[in-house]
A protein has these predicted regions:
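Conserved helicase ATPase motor motifs in RecA-like P-loop NTPase domains
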Residues: 37-40, 136-137, 156-171
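Helicase motor interdomain insertion/brace
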Residues: 42, 143, 147, 174, ...
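Conserved Walker A/P-loop ATP-binding site and its immediately adjacent core
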Residues: 43-45, 58-76, 168-170, 368
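Conserved helix/coil segment N-terminal to the catalytic DExD/H
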Residues: 91-126
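Conserved helicase ATPase core of P-loop NTP-dependent helicases/translocases
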Residues: 92-99, 385-388, 392-424
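SF2 helicase catalytic motif II
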Residues: 111, 120-161
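Conserved segment of the helicase C-terminal RecA-like domain
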Residues: 457-482
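Single conserved hydrophobic/aromatic residue that forms the stacking wall/gate
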Residues: 637-648
Length: 648
């Protein structure tokens, strides 16, 4: 085995792989998005690039979660003979500031980097490389977008390396990620590339089909009857193109159309529009109930209905609970003694693989309640030692798992204390989960990104197996075909070394050092450079007027994600995060500001908290100020869609 050699390397030798060297060489030529399957050592590629760029300046590497950042920091500290510092939310702001100055390599979570840039504790001028792990997250208001813009504006010799297994299934999605990160080339490798093939293990995928139980079919019939009635009303109102076989995407689009009608109506909103919003919200809830019945079973549907009943605050929920079809569906589910046949097939598959000598198995499930049920059942199998692995968010009766507990659970799984990890979507990305011989999907996922991430948990150092459980004639089949289609579409974007995607060049983006000659297109690389320029935030932002005195602004921690703080920092305002007893902003110690959107304002009026907040604001500050933001004050409509509570 040939080992990687460099004066800055230390610790155990690292295998030098041709594809890692080739991808790194391409990344050194210009800011690049490296797209490789999970398990092919994207972190080692980043190390290759770091070794060259450390001669020119410092390096920043980011990962979206603290456990993944810790994993990167541990690897780099073992491998590099330079000072590596880990900066996460567990390190206080006061302690982080000197570490920014002392470290040659900083590994951090993007939220910490964003906050430290806004408050002026971090400067990126002398960073010669910034690495964005899980780069596909660089969309919308995610911190990666702001950090990339600030880096491009301030760095003397900027170079960006984005890393992901799945950049997006459409050209527009990939363009957005690359533009947001100031990336001008894409370097992709997969099992079709000759320099990768020796390191790829085959993964066998098997689709395991089960029938829908008769009891679930009866419940589905009740819910479909209700859904057809609700969608029929939306169709008659011109909000849907058809009254039946309506997807969740179509229902969400109907909601956007209704919100547009609200804004257009101004203060004189017809009562029918509000009623239709409730109908649309009910249809979304019924759609999730149908999905639960078909893919999970009557037990999970009853759990969803019970939680809805306990939190029946919205008008849509109250109306739905009174519908005769909904009531009948609950009666039918309560009478049912059938378990979903997926559970029995899962038991059989796990028992079969354990008997064959498989040491570790990961089972992915969409819903926490199902994950708990699976752990309970699997624990009864001989030699099975299952453990549930879920996200940090709390649900009613389920507090979730802290990052400390998550890390301990994964260590026990790695050590063999547990041999079956039953994980929700938290196990797909951003955590150091050991590779396994077998991965089981309890249900297909419609997202190509999630499909690739789940499948990437096997087939790393040995051949792997993937089982996907599918209930026939249900939404499971639609999800399967959706993810497969999107994955094939993603592959077609980069095939054959053709210039499939055109993005703004660095000169067009307005940053860095223009005028460099473009490198030739190589196998697996996509040149980016001829599309119409996508306007950046800084293009449309008025230049800040220099103030006679420096304005100092304290921002409550809860307001940082809003994007206002980063906009103020862009305009030259010194921003400091703090814990304010009242309000969202404090200007020069005198002016206290409470910021509310139209929905916040109406909500605080309805729950009676508005006047208490205003009174406290007046008592606390010399100059109290209430800012109402947005143009929907007279038209905003509050309703909830609580299906997401099932996830994670």
């Amino acid at each position: 085995m040939k080992s990687l050699a460099h004066p800055l390397l230390q610790g155990p030798p690292l295998e030098e792989r041709a594809y890692q060297r080739n991808v790194a060489a391409a990344c050194l030529r210009e800011s690049t998005l490296a797209v490789l399957p999970t398990g092919l050592g994207k972190t080692v590629i980043a190390l290759h690039v770091m070794l060259e760029r450390l001669e020119m300046g410092r390096v920043l590497m980011m990962a979206p979660t603290r456990p993944l950042a810790e994993q990167h920091a541990d690897f780099l500290a073992r491998s590099l003979d330079v000072r590596v510092e880990l900066l996460t939310g567990s390190v206080s702001p006061a302690k982080r500031e000197p570490l920014w100055q002392a470290a040659q390599v900083v590994v951090a979570t993007p939220q910490v980097v964003e906050k430290d840039l806004i408050r002026g504790a971090a400067k990126l001028a002398d960073f010669a490389l910034v690495v964005f792990d899980e780069a596909h997250r660089a969309v919308g208001n995610y911190a990666y977008v702001f950090i990339a813009e600030r880096y491009d504006e301030t760095a003397r010799q900027p170079l960006v390396l984005g890393m992901t297994a799945s950049p997006g299934s459409t050209r527009a999605a990939v363009v957005e990620v690359c533009t947001n990160l100031r990336i001008t080339a894409i370097e992709k490798r997969d099992d079709r590339d000759p320099d990768v093939a020796p390191y790829i293990q085959p993964v066998q995928t098997r689709w395991v089909k089960v029938p829908l139980p008769a009891s679930a079919a009866r419940i589905r019939k009740d819910l479909r009857k209700l859904q057809d009635r609700l969608c029929g009303q939306l169709h008659l109102a011109g909000l849907l193109t058809r009254p039946r076989k309506v997807s969740t995407t179509m229902l969400l689009e109907a909601g956007r159309k209704l919100q547009a009608r609200l804004r257009a109506a101004g203060r004189d909103v017809p009562r029918q529009v509000y009623n239709l919003l409730s109908v649309q919200a009910m249809a979304l809830k019924v759609a999730h109930a149908l999905l639960t019945v078909e893919t999970q079973g009557p037990t999970q549907f009853l759990d969803y209905a019970a939680r809805m009943r306990k939190s029946s605050k919205s008008r849509a929920t109250k109306w739905l609970l009174q519908k005769p079809e909904w009531k009948q569906a609950i009666i039918d589910a309560a009478r049912s003694s059938d378990e979903h046949p997926k559970l029995e097939r899962l038991d059989e598959l796990v028992a079969q693989e354990l008997a064959a000598g498989v040491g570790r198995i990961i089972v992915f499930a969409e819903i926490r309640n199902t994950a708990s049920l699976m752990v309970e059942r699997l624990s009864k199998l001989p030699a099975a030692r299952p453990v549930r692995f879920v996200g940090q968010g709390s649900r009613e009766g389920d507090p979730g798992m802290t990052q400390k507990v998550q890390k301990a659970t994964l260590e026990q799984f790695r050590a063999g204390d547990y041999n079956i990890l039953v994980a929700t979507s938290v196990g797909e990305e951003g955590l150091d989960i050991p590779a396994t011989a077998v991965v089981i999907f309890y249900e297909p996922v419609p997202s190509a990104i999630r499909l690739i991430q789940r499948r990437g948990r096997t087939g790393r150092d040995r051949p792997g197996k993937v089982y996907v459980l599918i209930t026939t004639d249900t939404r499971d089949e639609a999800a399967y075909w959706s993810s497969r289609s999107k994955e094939m579409q993603m592959q077609s974007l980069f095939g054959g070394g053709r210039m499939e995607i055109k993005l703004p060049s660095r000169a067009e983006l307005g940053g860095g050092s223009p005028g460099r000659d473009a490198p030739p297109v190589a196998r697996g690389q996509t040149r980016l450079g001829d599309a119409p320029r996508v306007p950046l935030q800084s293009d449309t932002t008025a230049e800040a007027t220099p103030a006679a005195e420096e304005v100092r602004l304290q921002v409550d921690h809860r307001e940082f994600p809003s994007g206002v703080a980063r906009e103020l920092a862009q305009r030259g305002v010194t921003v400091a995060p703090t814990q304010l007893p009242v309000g969202d902003y404090l200007i020069d110690g005198r002016v206290g500001v409470e910021r509310k959107t139209g929905a916040d304002f109406v909500g605080s009026m309805l729950d009676g908290s508005l006047f208490r907040q205003v009174k406290a604001l007046k008592q606390q500050f010399r100059r109290p100020l209430l800012i109402l933001e947005g143009d929907d004050l007279y038209t905003c409509f509050l309703y909830t869609f609580d299906a997401a509570d099932d996830m994670q």
